[in-house]
Amino acid sequence: MNVNKTVTIMLAAGLLMTGNVVATNKPAAVFTPEQEARIGEVAKDYLLAHPEVLIEVSQKLQAQQEQQQQRAMTAAAVQHQNVLLNDKDTPSYGPADAKVTVVEFFDYQCIYCARLAPELEKVIRANPDVRFVFKEFPIFGQRWPESVSAAKTGLQIWRQKGADAYLKYHNAIYATGHNEGKLTDADIRSAAEAVKLDASKAADVQGTLDEINLLAQQMGFSGTPALVVLP
């Protein structure tokens, strides 16, 4: 793939605002302690009288941070495009030669992933020429073990049953409406049984989860859902 092609990244995550320090070769002005105190009072009085200035500065800093984050993630997507697109252990749905691929990092217990799921299901149905890659990223696993169980079961279904069965399982888990700690082992078993997963032949997929977690870190993702669109 041509690395100059456009990479689009969308994610649900908070932004950390930071300021920029600009160095110049001009000598710094020297003020007496009294002058410094007076300057501080004037600045404080002005900001109290004009709080919109703080809002404007905050918005500008946030915009700068968004641009920096977008550039960093775009560069990471280009750098890791091979594993994003061609990892055989990662579930996918759609033509292998698709001109557009959508990669989703998600957790079945994530409420925002759950809200996105039915909309993404519509997109999949409406775009049979687009390939969708599903990166099981159970970030809530320490809080809710079922996040990891559901992710592992999904990967096992992918290996054993293929794309159609995986997508059916994936949608069935979200269709339970159980997230944020409400997903149960019974929910997972029911969805797996519906696609006839043979639990006695289930593969060990912890290594795949570890690789996805590492990839997410390299991409700069700390929350879900995260979507990467690659041409």
Give residue spans per PLM region.
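Intrinsic low-complexity, intrinsically disordered segments enriched in polar/basic residues
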Residues: 3, 18, 67-69, 187-191
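Extracytoplasmic thiol/disulfide redox context detector
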Residues: 16-143, 204-223
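Gram-negative bacterial Sec-dependent N-terminal signal peptides
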Residues: 1-22
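Cysteine-centric redox/oxidoreductase cores and disulfide-bonded domains
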Residues: 64, 139-231
